[in-house]
A protein has these predicted regions:
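Redox-cofactor-proximal catalytic regions of oxidoreductases
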Residues: 1-72
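Conserved beta-strand-loop-beta-strand element in the redox core of flavoprotein oxidoreductases
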Residues: 175-179
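Conserved redox-cofactor binding core of oxidoreductases
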Residues: 50-173
Length: 179
């Protein structure tokens, strides 16, 4: 009844929404890509453009600890995609996507049982929450067992609680007011 995914069906379309504290950040693949400036050329109010949003992209990137997968942790598929891009002359356009995941630059597949949760290094984030580093177990969409995924409950909501906010699961917010 009160799971962390809420499924909604709308005729020809169904959606999955995050239903726990942290919302949609609990069930996404952590991809954090900035829209390119040209994306705002049509269909957006004039006041909303890349220049206006850039400081917010930067702030969010810091809060979510956005980073790229270290080169020593690329999968064979990632290497093949890079080789393919190079082969067709588009190597300069190939990039791994920025993700809201904390990677350990020393993690590698050569160690015994590399995907073991025991290889995750714990650390305390700026909001005082204990997290781990990614061990590439592949459970990003389902919930990271080592808390390397930087979900909103570990950063923005934790910062709000640290500032005195009261986070109440299973409640609907109707208004927000200063006290």
């Amino acid at each position: 009844q009160n799971g962390w995914i809420d499924f909604r069906y709308f005729g020809d379309m169904s959606i999955a929404m995050g239903a726990g504290v942290g919302g949609g950040s609990l069930i996404y693949a952590n991809v954090s890509i900035e829209a390119k400036p040209e994306a705002f050329a049509q269909g957006w109010p004039e006041a909303i453009d890349y220049t206006t949003l850039k400081p917010h992209y930067d702030t969010t990137g810091v809060m979510l600890n956005v980073q790229e997968l270290p080169g020593n942790q690329w999968t064979p598929r990632t290497h093949l995609m890079k080789e393919g891009a190079d082969a067709v002359g588009a190597g300069d356009r190939f990039h791994v996507v920025p993700q809201a995941i904390t990677f350990d630059p020393d993690w590698n597949t050569q160690r015994d049982d590399p995907y073991s949760y025991g290889h995750s290094k714990t650390w305390v984030n700026p909001q005082g929450k204990t997290q781990g580093t990614c061990v590439h177990c592949g459970n990003c969409d389902l919930g990271c067992p080592v808390q390397a995924k930087n979900t909103l409950d570990l950063n923005y909501l934790a910062a709000a609680e640290n500032a005195g906010a009261d986070v109440r699961p299973l409640h609907h917010v109707r208004t927000i007011r200063a006290v």
